[in-house]
């Protein structure tokens, strides 16, 4: 096995690797930072790397530039939802991470929640609101059915973009209007009052869990990327049994949506001690200070070793 891995690594270092980053999604700025960090990590490991901003360079140029393999660093729409993966399949260029189906199902918060529920994976109660029916709905009944406080989430956005919490009819109406600016379908999820964790998946391994703490109402875009008061704990402070349990649940959720290679699963614990899976991220943030590199470091991998392993996982046997 070791010899096979060494051989695949040697072959990868003969390839021309494109790190695709930037793009047109609402997560463009995060993607630019991820792509630059990944490219540097791969270069430090001895790979032949070229950075390509898909907002500027058309994908068809990958063929003319003789790209052998792609490391996907595009977050959100167009990069994480199966569209890019389908284009790369058509161009016959191998790539990191999940395939078309796994990417699209994981990105879609509504479909992934439906899958979790069908598979018996614990997740908070929810309902779905479509833009076309918004004006005819009883927001009062929806709020009551979900316990009086909800998280409002556009179905296909990441980095907490377009998300808000609501506990009054007016707040819910305003949050839905805001969310419909990003998507025609919105997930309403019962509010979970408890700590949030995240588990990185790398191949068949679940890395050490991270506990995120923020003084804000929830772990929103500002808490993730702008706040200096957000705290990250890894080791996460759970006992061995509880950590093993969230690792197992995270792996089940990852496999349930058809995700592959690597990713990150977000999970919360409610007041009664029950775990609630939030979502699967198939292209999580990858700056030097992002969550996945933090977990990898505790696991014993530096950043270059981490991106090398992700690239190796793209080699199909």
From Swiss-Prot:
Q: Which reaction does it catalyse?
A: 2 D-alanine + ATP = D-alanyl-D-alanine + ADP + phosphate + H(+)
**Compartmental location:** Cytoplasm
Where is each ATP-grasp domain found? 113-312
Positions of ATP binding: 143-198
Q: What is its EC number?
A: 6.3.2.4
List the Gene3D superfamilies: 3.40.50.20, ATP-grasp fold, A domain, ATP-grasp fold, B domain
Q: Cofactor binding mode, per the note?
A: Binds 2 magnesium or manganese ions per subunit.
Output the PROSITE patterns linked to this UniProt entry: ATP_GRASP, DALA_DALA_LIGASE_1, DALA_DALA_LIGASE_2
Listed InterPro entries: ATP-grasp, ATP_grasp_subdomain_1, D-Ala_lig_Van_CS, D_ala_D_ala, Dala_Dala_lig_C, Dala_Dala_lig_N, PreATP-grasp_dom_sf
Write out the pathway annotation from the protein's UniProt entry.
Cell wall biogenesis; peptidoglycan biosynthesis
Q: Which SMART domains match?
A: GARS_A
The residues that the entry says bind Mg(2+) 1 are 266, 279
Q: Is ATP-binding found in the keyword set?
A: yes
The cofactor required is: Mg(2+); Mn(2+)
The record's listing under SUPFAM superfamilies reads: Glutathione synthetase ATP-binding domain-like, PreATP-grasp domain
Task: State the Gene Ontology terms under molecular function.
Answer: ATP binding; D-alanine-D-alanine ligase activity; metal ion binding
Q: Which residues bind Mg(2+) 2?
A: 279, 281
Functional summary from the UniProt entry = Cell wall formation.
Question: Which HAMAP family does the record match to this protein?
Answer: Dala_Dala_lig
Entries under PANTHER family matching the protein: D-ALANINE--D-ALANINE LIGASE, D-ALANINE--D-ALANINE LIGASE B
Describe the family membership recorded for this protein in Swiss-Prot or TrEMBL: Belongs to the D-alanine--D-alanine ligase family.
Q: What is this protein called?
A: D-alanine--D-alanine ligase
Q: Which organism is it from?
A: Colwellia psychrerythraea (strain 34H / ATCC BAA-681) (Vibrio psychroerythus)
Q: Which gene encodes it?
A: ddl
């Amino acid at each position: 096995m070791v010899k096979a891995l060494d051989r695949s690594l040697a072959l990868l270092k003969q390839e021309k690797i494109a790190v695709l980053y930037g793009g047109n999604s609402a997560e463009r700025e995060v993607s630019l930072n991820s792509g630059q960090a990944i490219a540097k990590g791969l270069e430090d490991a001895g790979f032949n790397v070229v950075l390509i901003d898909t907002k500027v360079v058309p994908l068809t140029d990958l063929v003319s530039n003789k790209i052998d393999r792609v490391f996907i660093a595009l977050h959100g729409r167009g990069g994480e939802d199966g569209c890019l993966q389908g284009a790369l399949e058509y161009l016959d260029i191998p790539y990191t991470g999940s395939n078309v189906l796994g990417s699209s199902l994981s990105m879609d918060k509504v479909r992934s929640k439906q899958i979790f529920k069908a598979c018996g994976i614990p997740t908070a109660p929810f309902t779905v609101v479509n833009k076309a029916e918004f004006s005819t709905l009883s927001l009062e009944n929806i709020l009551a059915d979900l316990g009086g406080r909800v998280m409002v989430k556009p179905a296909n956005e990441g980095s907490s973009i377009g998300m808000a919490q609501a506990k009054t009819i007016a707040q819910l109406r305003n949050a839905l209007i805001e969310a419909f600016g990003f998507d025609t379908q919105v997930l309403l999820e019962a509010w979970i009052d408890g700590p949030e964790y995240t588990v990185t998946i790398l191949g068949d391994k679940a890395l050490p869990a991270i506990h995120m703490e923020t003084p804000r109402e929830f772990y929103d875009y500002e808490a993730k990327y702008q706040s200096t008061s957000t705290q990250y704990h890894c080791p996460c402070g759970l006992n061995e049994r509880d950590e093993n349990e969230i690792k197992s649940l995270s792996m089940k959720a990852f496999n349930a949506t058809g995700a592959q290679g690597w990713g990150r699963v977000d999970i919360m614990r409610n007041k009664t001690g029950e775990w609630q899976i939030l979502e699967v991220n198939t292209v999580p943030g990858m700056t030097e200070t992002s969550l996945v590199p933090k977990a990898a470091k505790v696991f014993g991998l530096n950043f270059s070793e981490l991106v090398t392993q992700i690239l190796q996982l793209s080699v199909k046997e």
